[in-house]
Amino acid sequence: MTKYSQARLNSIIVKFILGVIILSLILSTISIYINRDFEKYIATVNGEKISFNLFKKMYFIEREKQKKILGKNFFKFSHNENFTKETYNYVLSQLINNVLLEQYAKNMNYLEVNDNTIKKIIYNSPIFQKNNKFSKERYLNYLTSINSTNHEYINIIKKKINTENLIHTISKSNFILKKEEKNIIKLLSQKRIIKKAIVKIDPSIYKKNITNQEAQIYFKKNQDNFYIPEKFKINFVELKTDNFKIHCENKEIYDWYIRNITQYSTKEKRRYSIIQVKNKQQAISILSRLHNTPEDFSKIAQEQSTDPISSKKDGDIGWISIDLIPDEIKHANLNKKNQISDVIPFHNEFLIVKLNETQIGTQKKIYEVFDSIKKQIKQKKSLDLYNELKNKISNNLKNDPGKIERILKENNILIQETDWFDKKSIPKVLNIPILKQFIFNKKLFQKDTTVKPQFHFIVLKKNQSFLIKIKKFKNKEIQHFENVKKNIIKKLRFIKAIKETKKKSEEIIYDLTQGRKKLFKQSNLYFTDPEIISRYDLSAITSIVFSLPHPQKGKKIYTLYNDKNKNFIIISLEKVYNTNFSEKEKNVILEYLSRHNTEIIFNSILKDLREKSIIKYENIVNK
């Protein structure tokens, strides 16, 4: 039974073909393919038309899929012109791919579909069923509705199945040569031993002289970096349910308790064990044995029950609330402890059920839930007051904005004022994406100081809203050279230090490559202990290390990179070797490569088909 419950939750199986998404067109509703006498079409592929009606339906399917993937962000993207255009083009491209594959399957004289297969598909199609049986009348009515003959309909089904078989064959037939397998495994199992030496920036370099002319040239070239950003001073009010002081009388708590008394009671629960078998005769035999030795229930459940979960727990399926007990078990009328049912038919299998325990429902006393009810009442009152105030503010902003400050005063809510801030120093309470978008949008506030600024009302989620008024504003302005001169000199010294350290490091590497260590030792450098680097390491140097050639005949390979602290690191590649993968690891790698290979094959076929085909687009949607 537990197996059945889990199956219901996992009843939808999503199949996909790697790399190529056909938008479920391969065996999609055939009716939208049949009627070729349409007035509008979106494209022709080698003379075969793709109807605009079909495009609209597939576009709708794709949009629904996007909704599920993007969730709440869907509506933000759906109004984006580029996003909409990309979706149009994507759907159209997949429709064209589908037609190309159909034509390819036909030209290859692909395996002819057996007539019995076609017959089986039609006979088992739900739309042609009546009372769980094939209805010829429904079938003929359907053909009439789509303006098709029986022969045309069968040919369409054949075309769809041939295309599906083609895709299936391609996806199954890809392979990797044994030699290629070995090379890839060897490449992925490779490890490298390195040593590192850190070349730090010499502090004395920071004392180098920088002329006034150098500083001025840098200032002029990088003026965009020397602006004082625009600044804001804001009046704001944060409205939350916490703004209100709420009182709650004992009578209110008592009334709430009486009104919602069912919420404060626990329902009766029952604990059952089951034995589930597929054969009725086996169930009857087990029941007969239990009549003689009921204490064997757990043992039999463990040994013979087909339910994979409860059989491991001696048949125990746990506690079930009285309102959630399946009807089949309810009708067995088990009311006594250790009472065993007769054989119960259950979803093509058979159950024997035992009642282990019963837990009677209880009613909580008011003192047990007093604090919880008090909290609920306060939350409700706060929410009601918040919504009332929110609506009042919203209405007055439209009709009489001058009243806003009086409304706030009546509710003992103070207007707060910020200090000057810019985009990098926004107060924490206002550091919310929607608020920042509003504050820094110059079109939404008045910079003319002769006009009195007005409040703007922004409603957020979770019962929170803000009244915001831009009180003062300062435009960004260029800083004077003298005010930033010290910072520029410091910056130029650092740039020079980096250049000189890099030059020195490159000279050391050249020396080491020639087999000399004099400059290395003069710089008081040393190599760290050996490190083993794998291709799967997430280190910043992994790609650098594996881009180096193999050391030859005892010679080491050297390279240089700059770390996050601006130090230069000399890397010495000492050794390259391979480890052995387990068979399981090899299979995982080869399976991934096989899938990737499938994608390449599909893309190659489609690219070739497009190049050889005549595809014409109509001006119905953006191409």
From Swiss-Prot:
Belongs to the PpiD chaperone family. Residues 1-11 are cytoplasmic. Interacts with the SecYEG translocon. Binds to the lateral gate of SecY. Forms a complex with YfgM. The chain crosses the membrane at residues 12-32. It is a single-pass type II membrane protein. It is found in: Cell inner membrane. Keywords: Cell inner membrane, Cell membrane, Chaperone, Membrane, Transmembrane, Transmembrane helix. InterPro entries: PPIase_dom_sf (IPR046357), PPIase_PpiC (IPR000297), PpiD_chaperone (IPR052029), Trigger_fact/SurA_dom_sf (IPR027304). The keyword Cell inner membrane applies. Chaperone that functions as a gatekeeper on the periplasmic side of the SecYEG translocon. Facilitates the translocation of precursor proteins across SecYEG by interacting with the translocating substrate. Also plays a role in the release of newly synthesized secreted proteins at the periplasmic exit site of the Sec translocon. Residues 33-623 are periplasmic. GO terms for cellular component: plasma membrane. Residues 267-357 form the PpiC domain. One of its GO terms (molecular function) is peptidyl-prolyl cis-trans isomerase activity. Its main location: membrane. This is Periplasmic chaperone PpiD. The gene is ppiD.
